[in-house]
């Protein structure tokens, strides 16, 4: 690390989240290079362990010039480990900014045309699904179509190499299916298989509701923010242990719903799809959440430039 720092001679070194390397910070300190931690977070369990080592770690944390923590709780934990109180702020989670990618209306129009999904068709999407989830989603879809005959399920598996297997599964459930990768459309189909890469976020914009996969089976889940950022009613299961803090924020804001079973998912989806009031309420909650939780990247950049790069 000393060789790297000497070779680059940085004006500022930025560490991210939990990547706090003692040797790196020590090398920076001895060369007069400011060290800043952005999007910092410390889980309660990690804090308990680190606090037992506080006498040894205090010089490390005191060496940090600035810390931008994700939450007020994280801010207090950093202070408890030795970061100078005036050097740590809680500005929010950078990940909230990273998911704001709103495609242009013309792009969404082209996507709707190429996929055959019209604006007046009721659509729900299963995003980043895993093996064991799709069969249950297809059963739910079959029941939902008893009330909404033209309802479309966009099925986006986490592993697109499972596409052929999923086509057979759809047919076993009596569902006609179109594949995105083959240039097929959703017209006349009850399921549209999104077996391509990089399009899931855009398809959330075409949906009326979204389920986030990897959560009703114990995989840890995928980030629900992507669907929430599209202002869609978003549902997930109990195993979202990879995104607990984000989950807590979303539930508190009322712009997502946690379900514990497929039966609960069916009930929640049925209520959402038949009620424009529920959809509008969750959309408003999502808008309010995004307005209060985004923008920290701009604030951090402004402070870094003002302190370390101003003339």
Residue ranges and their predicted role:
Residues 1-311:
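Nucleotide-activated sugar donor-binding and catalytic core shared by glycosyltransferases
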